[in-house]
Amino acid sequence: MLGRMYDIATRQSALDLVAQGHSLNSVSKQTGISRAAIRAWQVRIEPLPRMLIDLAPCPRCRPEPGTPDDTAAYSYLLGLYLGDGCISPHPRGSFYLRIACADAWPGLIEACRAAITAVRPEGGVYNLQKQGYAMVTSYWRHWPCLFPQHGAGRKHERPIILEPWQQEIVDAHTWEFVRGLIHPDGCRATNWTTRTIGGETRRYEYPRYWFSNVSGDIRRLFTDALDRLGVEWKQANARNISVARRASVALMDAHIGSKH
């Protein structure tokens, strides 16, 4: 069993005590957790997946491949995955979907968890806490089926092209897709400038949205989506896209807003 009933926070707290110099015996007595469980967590903190219990059918593996039931949630999750997500294999043949979410934006963490749950209601979602961010994680053998952009190496080192069925979802839920891209790789910022009018220097502030990604393919997916939505944008430099026109910022505010 090795403490499978304990959540990630409890496991991490026990490991923190060990890291502070406490012995396994003393941590076990203090927490009531067996030494065997703590020792196992030193090797692997994540709960062991239910290898033989995978009841959720994959919509892409049906005789007639389909899409997730909640396509709006999928469009948002696709944006999150392309921004700060990855799919990593488990030695026994299944996969983890992991989305990195900064601790500074707890609302983003909850939105990410909700999207994963909506796309795969039968599965579990948990946060693996790291320094400054949470790795929102879900285990399923079919994650690569839903995110065929998964592959060896970093995203900016390989082509990122949506499958036709993904593009249909993004076309139907474009704002959700843009929100998913902005949340990990973008922000709403306030710039300012000064002007001298009649001998008086005045400060003017104006908001804008930024999106940054090393992958040219992902930046293109973002700007193509903005074009469909009627949002004006500019390529600020090699990696950054800027939305600064007042009407376009207002449109983004109505559908995206600041992270929280």
Residue ranges and their predicted role:
Residues 1-260:
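Internal intein/HINT superfamily modules and their associated LAGLIDADG
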